[in-house]
């Protein structure tokens, strides 16, 4: 590559990292937006490893923002298991429910991941347009919900329903955070509990998918050839995810989810008409 090509390659990956970083934490579907950008501008990453790298960047942002919750859950789970501290039971059960909610998406990913990818590849933008409208309708349903359940009130049923919703979100255009938030709030969770459950649930899912892709990363020649653009995308996605999640947490506190429904309707309709 010459200097000019190197520059535009870096810009290219910067844009992809920015799109991933902004759209991953908020309920508008990061995978759907990547497909839209690919169709509009011909922007597409080379190599199977890119998606894993930017997902890890978003994961790092989530880990930093929820670090206190993670430490508390880990410590109290340890105390409940090995010290039989009854006051730590609710945190231990919260971890159990996170594990339960992870199982459905793991099953769907392992059994049907390739089939879903092939189906989406045939007419990706049409699927994204339709699923963005579905996401909008789901968000609209919960715009005024104010549940009462906190972490100690959750049940196995809650975990399974949220887990099934997350499994549905493997389809591009169905937001993972949106699907899990909608399911959580329909099950009666308070907004802050639903938000915490949704993003703590992202951790095992992202880690699991990344671990499964390690062999592909090792074999992928693009990792060595494009390590600088990949690094740019990683840093960009991390910074964008961090601030996007902080912003979204503030939006949730003020109950303004309806604006994401408006956005998904507008983008979904435009995609169906023009792409």
From Swiss-Prot:
It catalyses: di-trans,octa-cis-undecaprenyl diphosphate + H2O = di-trans,octa-cis-undecaprenyl phosphate + phosphate + H(+). Its EC number is 3.6.1.27. Pfam families: BacA (PF02673). GO terms for cellular component: plasma membrane. It is found in: Cell membrane. Its main location: membrane. GO terms for biological process: cell wall organization; peptidoglycan biosynthetic process; regulation of cell shape; response to antibiotic. It is an enzyme of class 3 (hydrolase). The chain crosses the membrane at residues 8-28, 45-65, 92-112, 119-139, 197-217, 225-245, 255-275. Keywords: Antibiotic resistance, Cell membrane, Cell shape, Cell wall biogenesis/degradation, Hydrolase, Membrane, Peptidoglycan synthesis, Transmembrane, Transmembrane helix. It is a multi-pass membrane protein. Catalyzes the dephosphorylation of undecaprenyl diphosphate (UPP). Confers resistance to bacitracin. Belongs to the UppP family. PANTHER family: UNDECAPRENYL-DIPHOSPHATASE. This is Undecaprenyl-diphosphatase. It comes from Oceanobacillus iheyensis (strain DSM 14371 / CIP 107618 / JCM 11309 / KCTC 3954 / HTE831). The gene is uppP.
């Amino acid at each position: 590559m010459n200097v000019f090509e190197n520059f535009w390659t870096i810009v290219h990956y910067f844009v992809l990292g920015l799109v991933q970083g902004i759209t991953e934490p908020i309920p508008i579907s990061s995978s759907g937006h990547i497909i839209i950008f690919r169709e509009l501008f011909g922007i597409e990453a080379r190599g199977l490893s890119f998606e894993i790298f930017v997902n890890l960047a978003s994961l790092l942002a989530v880990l930093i923002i929820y670090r206190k919750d993670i430490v508390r859950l880990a410590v109290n789970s340890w105390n409940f298991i090995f010290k039989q501290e009854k006051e730590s039971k609710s945190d231990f059960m919260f971890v159990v429910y996170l594990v339960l909610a992870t199982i459905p998406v793991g099953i769907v990913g392992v059994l049907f991941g390739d089939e879903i990818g092939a189906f989406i590849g045939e007419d990706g933008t049409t699927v994204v347009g339709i699923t963005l409208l579905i996401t909008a309708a789901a968000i609209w349903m919960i715009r005024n919900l104010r549940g009462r359940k906190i972490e100690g009130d959750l049940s196995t049923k809650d975990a399974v329903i949220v887990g099934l919703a997350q499994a549905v979100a493997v389809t591009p255009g169905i937001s993972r955070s949106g699907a899990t938030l909608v399911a959580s709030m329909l099950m009666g969770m308070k907004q802050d509990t639903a938000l915490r459950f949704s993003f703590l649930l992202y951790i095992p899912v992202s880690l699991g998918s990344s671990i499964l892709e390690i062999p592909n990363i090792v074999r992928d020649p693009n990792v060595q050839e494009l390590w600088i653009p990949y690094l740019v995308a990683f840093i960009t996605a991390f910074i964008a995810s961090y601030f996007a999640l902080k912003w979204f947490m503030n939006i949730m506190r003020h109950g303004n989810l309806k604006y994401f429904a408006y956005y998904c309707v507008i983008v979904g309709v435009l995609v169906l008409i023009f792409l």
